[in-house]
Curated annotation (Swiss-Prot):
The keyword Cytoplasm applies. This is Integrator complex subunit 3. Component of the integrator complex, a multiprotein complex that terminates RNA polymerase II (Pol II) transcription in the promoter-proximal region of genes. Belongs to the Integrator subunit 3 family. Residues 977-1043 are annotated as: Disordered. Residues 1008-1022 have a biased composition (Acidic residues). The modification Phosphoserine is found at S502, S537, S995. Keywords: Acetylation, Cytoplasm, DNA damage, DNA repair, Nucleus, Phosphoprotein. It is found in: Nucleus; Cytoplasm. It comes from Pongo abelii (Sumatran orangutan). The gene is INTS3. Component of the Integrator complex, composed of core subunits INTS1, INTS2, INTS3, INTS4, INTS5, INTS6, INTS7, INTS8, INTS9/RC74, INTS10, INTS11/CPSF3L, INTS12, INTS13, INTS14 and INTS15. The core complex associates with protein phosphatase 2A subunits PPP2CA and PPP2R1A, to form the Integrator-PP2A (INTAC) complex. Component of the SOSS complex, composed of SOSS-B (SOSS-B1/NABP2 or SOSS-B2/NABP1), SOSS-A/INTS3 and SOSS-C/INIP. SOSS complexes containing SOSS-B1/NABP2 are more abundant than complexes containing SOSS-B2/NABP1.
């Protein structure tokens, strides 16, 4: 297999030095268009990205050809210093050489490392773009070199390489055992295995890698080569699951689903035994399988098992294809991805993706677009394997089993009920099978948790009725098309839903929660899975595409989307004649330049002194209708350069913004244009984030971001914060790429509005992917973005505790990129409960282990309530014992003595006055006792240190009998220390008789001997006699006093 040879060459090159090649030259031998990046034919148009990369490569080649290495380096560095565009050209040129010229790869990588001024950010972004958009057309040689380059980036520890690895993993298709796919799976696995220490630094990468390879293990069986790969995958997953289980816990309930599929593999059998019978062996914070099953899986994980091409085409079907015209699309998808026996396992991935990721808006739901339930019905009916069919049904109902209305979304459970409802007439067998599965899964999923599963399914059905997805379930459960046994079982399991005689009615709702609705579909149910005329383009990509990664890059062959003609007739009669003529010219304008000229004339007329301001509302209505296409289209160019940004703001609408930027704020014309924008904003809220984009992208608007504040105050909202949040929310829903592009400038220009709460942060982390997270982290570290400040970071992180797991990890990653002392947020510990907040506890624990224990840190750690299942405090104390034992001993001594000195009444008053836990003496002693037990079988001598023993003596001398009894083993350490210590001179004893501890030490020799004797005698006894022993010591001390 040629690609395997390439892999070997790449690996050899990675280990080589000097001018050794990058390997993989043999892989592309004889490929069409040799030396080029992408496969193409003579009929294909030249790819824009390829042209640009080849241009950059020719610049580098012209500068380095025929000169010495030193001269070449000098020339490259001199060129890079000229500015950012030149820096980008050289980086991309060297990057292209690495991909196309294996023999020069090692040298080019060294040059790239030397000239890069942005931590390889340009190269990382370009790799992500190629993987997401061009990988299927990439030449074999370039694929091999891309793997080689990623391996080098990982070896060099380049920040952001983890994001590239995750994008690479996304390209590994499930259910595909072709040579190229197996090569890719093995190549990425080799990188992750070789660079294991690097992998362990990224929690998200650990979880994503485990999720990916657990899923792939199922596909790899049969041949010796696949078995060998499978064993490597098993070893990799098992090692990460056992060593970093808390990081894997962020996957949520789908981790259990994947582990069930591999449960018969011996290594996973042993892991299952620990998960069920000994969860603490995996992590002190893991309480059992229920903890996993009650955690919803983030859409990031569900999406990672579909390749970009699959995802794009599936999204196209659910947003562009009309119901009744889907057959050719489905046939194409079937031929491309589901035609082999091995590919049947992909159906689960597709169903989980549709349920958990594809959540259409109410606008799409109420249209005639192909609904989700129809695609799932097709996937179920076309399944050719019994095992795959069972797994597909489990995937469909998986979120039902432990559904909680507070944590889970109605959109995750809605497809299953609608598949059953709509299949009853055309495919009753499908409905019967699914209802039977729903009943039988309750006792059979996991018998010890049968009660939880029953409650989950009941909550799902109840929520479906409450949200009016179906008004009643009785017509579905009591339908005469079902056999008697099944109907009896449904009545037995769900009597609450079998009482209403009303016919099934699906209701349109206006709630924010999106629902499926019946409306247009009733007459098409007969053929809901396999109808009509339409087709995918067989081209993997549309060469003229512009836009974000997940935009649709292919179109129907027989149907094209026809824009409905804009009708502004109702408004024209209300306009002055001259303005009406100009608006009509704007409507008829064929090119952007002509429209811009007319738009400028309209603005000029608005600014004339005799303009009737009452016409602003009508004019705004006309403009909103005329620019509908502009608001639907892409805003941010695919290639972000100064030229492309300037070109993107050359649209007619943006002329209003440009005129606004050229005016003084105290000018009456300025107010008039703001009023026009305010009217437009009422009719088209997207105008807000378009203004933000213009102020960010246009050179004419440089330094004018404060205009947005004037705009916000001119709107009906009248408030900057509310307006900004609404506009960013609209941007988040329309274009995540644009949201990420705007984020640095929004945080920089409006710090008071963005940094005081977590509202904007939550919007961002809810939609970004791993590559975009890495990009934001880079912005923070380069000083371009500040998302947290000391005075509000604690409150924001506390707010984040209610977010989804992946969102919380993103928030913590962004926080850790800032240079904010950990002590600033350490009080969050008092808000964290070990069952409810594992994400925050894991991140905080991993950060605390890098810090030296300050008194405040130790105080907060010790103030956590003691619980046998909460190992947080013991874990970090143990780590500090190993690394900073003397410092920790001093901190604990200080806290013990302080808390022991506080009057008891004052302590209880203080603790009752606050809802948050206060540090008490008993808490400290409980945590120390747990630590003592944890260190019992180690060589660590933490409790033999003088400060700890002195502090324990101090506490023992003044605490009550109940505490002495409870912590007798702990206090016995101090007694042994006292017995072994040298007695102080007589003169010092006399001077110190006023303190209880001194009086205790002043015990007369006969009593001391008696104490020693009783101590040695009690070594073979139980700990119960010890309080009695202390009483004897206490009485002797009193005797000393009386003397």
């Amino acid at each position: 297999m040629e690609l395997q040879k390439g892999k070997g060459a790449a690996a050899a090159a990675a280990a080589a030095s000097g001018a050794a090649g990058g390997g993989g030259g043999g892989a592309g031998a004889g490929a069409p268009g040799g030396g080029r990046l992408l496969l193409s034919t003579s009929l294909d148009a030249k790819d824009e990205l390829e042209e640009r990369l080849e241009r950059c490569m020719s610049i580098v080649t012209s500068m380095t050809a025929g000169v010495s290495e030193r001269e070449a380096n000098d020339a490259l560095n001199a060129y890079v210093c000229k500015g950012l565009p030149q820096h980008e050209e050289i980086c991309l040129g060297l990057f292209t050489l690495i991909l196309t010229e294996p023999a020069q790869a090692q040298k080019c990588y060294r040059d790239l490392a030397l000239v890069s001024r942005d931590g390889m950010n340009i190269v990382l972004n370009k790799i992500n773009q190629i993987l997401m958009e061009k990988y299927l057309k990439l030449q074999d040689t370039c694929r091999t070199q891309l793997v080689w380059l990623v391996r080098e980036l990982v070896k060099s520890g380049v920040l952001g390489a983890d994001g590239v690895c995750m994008t690479f993993m996304k390209q590994i298709a499930g259910g595909d055992v072709t040579a190229k796919n197996i090569w890719l799976a093995e190549s990425v696995l080799d990188i992750l295995t070789e660079q294991r220490e690097w992998v362990l630094k990224s929690s998200i990468l650990i979880a994503m890698a485990v999720y990916t390879y657990l899923r792939l293990i199922v596909d790899h069986h049969g041949t010796a080569q696949l078995q060998a790969l499978r064993q490597k995958e098993v070893d990799f997953c098992i090692s990460l699951l056992r060593e970093r289980f808390m990081e894997c816990l962020m996957i949520g309930r789908d981790l259990v689903r994947l582990l069930q599929n591999v449960a018969r593999i011996p290594e996973f059998e042993l892991l299952w035994k620990d998960i069920i019978h000994n969860p603490q062996a995996l992590s002190p914070q893991f309480t059992g399988i229920l903890q996993l099953l009650q955690s919803r899986t983030s859409r990031k994980f569900l999406a990672c098992r579909l390749t970009p091409d699959m995802e794009t085409k599936l999204l196209f079907m659910t947003s562009r294809v009309r119901f009744g015209q889907q057959k050719r699309y489905q046939d194409w998808f079937q031929r491309q991805y589901l035609s082999t026996p091995d590919s049947q396992s992909l159906r689960c991935d597709l169903i989980r993706y549709i349920c958990g990721v594809v959540h259409p808006s109410n606008e799409v739901l109420s249209s005639d677009i192909l609904p989700r339930w129809a695609i799932i019905g097709w996937l179920l009916t076309a399944c050719t394997s019994n095992v795959a069919a069972s797994n597909a049904k489990l995937a469909l109902f998986y979120d039902w089993l432990f559904f909680s209305p507070d944590k889970d979304s109605i959109m995750n459970i809605e497809p299953a009920i609608l598949v059953m409802h709509h299949s009853m007439k055309p495919h009753p067998a499908i409905t019967a099978t699914l209802l039977d599965f729903m009943c039988r899964i309750i006792p059979n999923f996991y018998p010890p948790l049968e009660g939880h599963v029953r409650q989950g399914v009941f909550s799902s059905l109840n929520h479906i009725v409450e949200k009016r997805v179906l008004a009643h379930l009785a017509p579905l459960f009591d339908n005469p098309k079902l056999d008697k046994e099944l109907r009896a079982m449904l009545r037995e399991k769900f009597p609450e839903f079998c009482s209403s005689p009303s016919p099934p009615v699906e209701v349109k709702i206006e709630e924010p929660v999106s629902m499926e609705m019946d409306n247009h579909m009733s007459d098409k149910d007969e053929s809901c899975y396999d109808n009509a005329e339409a087709a995918f383009s067989d081209d993997e990509e549309d060469l003229n595409s512009k836009g974000k990664k997940r935009e649709f890059r292919f179109h129907p062959i027989k149907e094209t989307v026809v824009e409905e003609p804009v009708d502004i007739t109702p408004y024209l009669d209300q306009l002055d004649e001259s303005l009406r003529d100009k608006v009509l010219q704007l409507q008829k304008g064929s090119d952007t330049e002509a429209q811009c000229e007319v738009m400028q004339e309209i603005v000029d007329q608005v600014l004339e002194e005799d303009f009737d301001s009452e016409q602003l509302s009508v004019l705004a209505s006309c403009l909103q209708e005329l620019f509908k296409a502009h608001f639907r289209g892409e805003v941010l160019p695919e290639e972000i350069t100064e030229e492309s940004l300037e070109e993107s703001v050359g649209k007619p609408l943006y002329l209003i913004f440009r005129n606004l930027c050229q005016m003084q704020e105290d000018n009456s014309s300025f107010s008039l244009l703001l009023d026009l924008l305010s009217e437009l904003y009422q009719k088209q809220p997207k105008i807000g984030y378009h203004l933000l984009y213009y102020l960010r992208a246009s050179k004419a608007a440089a330094g004018k971001m404060n205009l947005y504040e004037s705009f916000a105050q001119a709107t009906q909202l009248g408030d900057l914060h509310t307006c900004l949040m609404m506009d960013m929310k609209a941007c988040q829903e329309d274009d995540v790429r644009l949201l990420c592009h705007l984020t640095p400038s929004i945080y920089t220009e409006f710090p008071d509005e963005t940094l005081r709460s977590g509202e904007l942060l939550n919007m961002i982390v809810a939609v970004i992917d791993s590559a975009q997270l890495q990009e934001l982290v880079c912005h923070v570290m380069m000083g371009n973005l500040v998302m947290f400040r000391k005075d509000s970071v604690l409150n924001i992180l506390i707010q984040s505790l209610d977010w989804e797991t992946f969102e919380q990890y993103c928030a913590w990653q962004l926080f850790l990129a800032h240079n904010i002392p950990l002590e600033t947020i350490i009080p969050i510990l008092q808000h964290l409960k070990y069952k409810e907040h594992p994400e925050a506890l894991s991140c905080l624990l991993l950060q605390l282990r890098r810090e030296k224990p300050s008194e405040e840190m130790v105080k907060m750690v010790l103030s956590r309530p003691c619980h046998p299942d909460d190992q947080f405090t013991t874990s970090i104390l143990r780590h500090w014992c190993m690394k900073h034992d003397e410092l920790l001993a001093e901190r604990i001594k200080s806290l013990l003595i302080k808390n022991n000195s506080l009057p008891r009444k004052r302590q209880s008053l203080r603790s009752s006055s606050s809802k948050l836990a206060q540090l008490t003496l008993e808490q400290i002693l409980e945590h120390l006792d747990n630590l003592r037990l944890n260190l019992t079988n180690t060589k660590q001598n933490f409790f033999s240190q003088t400060p700890i023993l002195q502090a324990l003596q101090h506490v023992q001398a003044s605490c009550d009998e109940a505490h002495k009894m409870k912590f007798s083993d702990l206090f016995s350490l101090a007694e042994e220390y006292e017995d072994s210590s040298t007695k102080p001179p007589k003169s010092r004893r006399k001077a110190a008789l006023s303190s209880p501890r001194s009086r205790k030490n002043a015990t007369q020799p006969p009593n001391a001997e008696e104490e020693s004797g009783s101590s040695s005698a009690s070594e073979e006894e139980d700990t119960k006699p010890k309080p009695t022993k202390r009483k004897r010591r206490g009485s002797s001390a009193v005797g000393s006093d009386s003397d």
